A protein has these predicted regions:
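Solenoid-like repeat scaffolds
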Residues: 37-44, 75-81, 113-119, 148-156, ...
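Generic helix N-cap/helix-start motif at coil->alpha-helix transitions
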Residues: 44-53, 82-89, 119-128, 154-164, ...
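Solenoidal tandem-repeat scaffolds enriched in leucines and small polar residues
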Residues: 152-257, 261
Length: 352
């Protein structure tokens, strides 16, 4: 992760340019009108301006080795302003991040916060980065504490921040809290991330709230009715809720609309029909999938086909499927089923 545009802008606006420009920057629109933190003075010595300016440029260019020299010089100055010290620790945190030293990066970012010298926008962004890294490092309690600190200081909530909070709650098995936070995040975003819906869906699943899970997918399908991924998700919800008829119905509709084009989808539809005691329909789906070359001709699929045909009382179909499964069978179960099918098809000599 390179320094983002917000950081480059702040470098230019606070302290690394003339004092007049810094004053002008303060007159720009306030991103956090409800902030409870007082804006500190963004000032530093000419030596710190020079060294930290060079360090920031080098970090932006991916030249962390060169940046380190100037960051170290700035950190060694005992009389540097709080802003210079905070900014130097922020740069050091970025260098550690680029080196995949996440605990060290978090520690340096935290020092930048504790010194309390950064302008509000920069301070809040560093705090948010800490929460993101804590989540990444599986310090979920820490991430929640940092997000709470961010909310208190900024006096606001955002969709992204709420989604981060929901993610942490989910990892801590606090599913209702995850649902509440993620539902609010999604409601605040014009284009919520797919991962947000996945976390919300998973939280519903953990609490057995299948109706809510189904409603969530149905809302998404209303906007994108031919999205096979969403259709499969809705079918999965119905399966988990033991509503096999509904699962089979939605997959059948997808098939009728020409949306089922993979072997996996054919197999899933066949299994759904079988679970709903619609074995003839299940056998027909398997037959069609094999005929189109979509279902892979392997042991598992032939065994499934044979089992479905047996349940559909279609001995010829079962015999054909079990015969194809037999050469790669891991045990004698398929051969036993094949013998059973041959016997009841009045082909007892072959069964022996």
């Amino acid at each position: 992760m390179k320094l983002s545009s917000w950081f480059a802008a702040l470098v230019c606006a606070f302290g690394l340019v003339a004092a007049g420009n810094a004053l002008a920057a303060r007159k720009t629109q306030n991103e956090y009108p409800n902030a409870t933190r007082s804006e500190p003075r963004a000032e530093m010595s000419s030596a710190d301006q020079r060294d930290l300016g060079k360090a920031a440029d080098y970090v932006n260019e991916g030249k962390d080795d060169k940046a380190q020299e100037y960051v170290t010089k700035a950190l060694s100055r005992k009389r540097s302003s709080p802003y210079a010290q905070s900014f130097a620790h922020q740069l050091q945190g970025q260098i550690y991040y680029d080196q995949d030293k996440m605990p060290e990066a978090i520690a340096e970012y935290r020092k930048a916060i504790e010194i309390n010298g950064l302008p509000n926008a920069q301070h809040f962004q560093v705090l948010y980065i800490i929460a993101q890294l804590e989540l990444q490092e599986e310090d979920y309690e820490g991430a929640l504490a940092t997000v709470a600190e961010w909310e208190k200081l900024t006096g606001t909530q955002t969709a992204d921040e709420l989604a981060l909070k929901a993610n942490a709650y989910y990892r801590l098995d606090q599913y209702q809290a995850a649902i509440d936070a993620m539902s609010k995040a999604i409601s605040m975003s014009d284009k919520p991330s797919d991962s947000w819906s996945q976390i919300l869906m998973a939280s519903y699943f953990e609490l057995g709230q299948y109706d809510q899970a189904a409603a969530l997918v149905q809302q998404q399908l209303a906007k994108d009715p031919k999205n096979m991924k969403l259709i499969n998700q809705l079918a999965t919800v119905y399966i988990q809720a033991d509503q096999m008829d509904k699962a089979a119905a939605i997959m059948t509709k997808a098939k009728d609309e020409g949306l089922i084009t993979s072997g996996a989808d054919y197999v899933q539809l066949a299994k759904l029909y079988a679970s709903a005691d619609k074995n003839k329909e299940a056998a027909a789906v398997m037959q069609e999938g094999f005929a189109k070359g979509l279902i892979e001709g392997n042991y598992d699929n032939y065994k499934l086909y044979g089992d479905i045909c047996m349940q559909a009382d279609n001995d010829a179909c079962a015999i054909e499927a079990y015969t194809k499964a037999s050469p790669t069978a891991p045990d004698g179960n398929v051969d036993y089923q094949l013998g059973y099918a041959l016997y009841y098809a009045d082909r007892s000599q072959e069964a022996i």
